[in-house]
Amino acid sequence: MLDTEDRIRLSSLMLEDTLQILSVAPPLTQVIIVSADKRADEIATKHGAKFLPEEKESGVNSAVALADGYCIEKEAADATIVIPHDLPLLDSIVISKACELAEKESTCIVICPSVRYDGTNMLLRKPPSVIGTFYETDSYNMHVRTAIKLGIPVKPLLSKSLMYDIDTPEDALQLIKEENVAAKSLEFIKSKL
């Protein structure tokens, strides 16, 4: 569907879309991007986000661990939210809702699955080290089962703006049908069809 150059462009646009939303989400005090790709550094800087470089792409769990270390040691964060950059329907209202769900809890996770319930499209952890992350296979169920096993309150947040991601060409085809979405990434996909 997309050649390598188009995929790089789409990835950059998805990151731009995500950072534009997160930069206006009132409860967030810091947005952190972890990547080995220097283009991500430029985009993060443009949106006032902190960029943490990886020496090489080591997977999502490694990137989250790097960000967790920074958040705990440098920011003294009492909670973190992990959000992938492939959510073109993302809005700041749902981020506020996730924070509200955790606000009165001393320990919890707030979690939103992917539309297929096999991935985790948003994971708020309070405190950040309350559970590790399992962004490999069936991450949504792994996160929920781990939290339950440890006696940590699980607060599901089911939101269309979080559940729909772009993991497959079929996902992209479904998402371009959405109306009133200002995501540059979706406009780019539409232009390539």
What is the role of each PLM region?
Residues 1-31:
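N-terminal glycine-rich phosphate-binding loop and ensuing alpha1 helix
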Residues 26-50:
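Acidic donor-binding segment of Leloir-type glycosyltransferases
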Residues 45-79, 140:
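Short phosphate-binding loop-to-helix
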Residues 90-116:
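Conserved donor-nucleotide/metal-binding helix-loop-beta segment in metal-dependent transferases, i.e.
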Residues 138, 144-193:
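Conserved alpha/beta core of the MobA/IspD/sugar-nucleotide pyrophosphorylase nucleotidyltransferase superfamily
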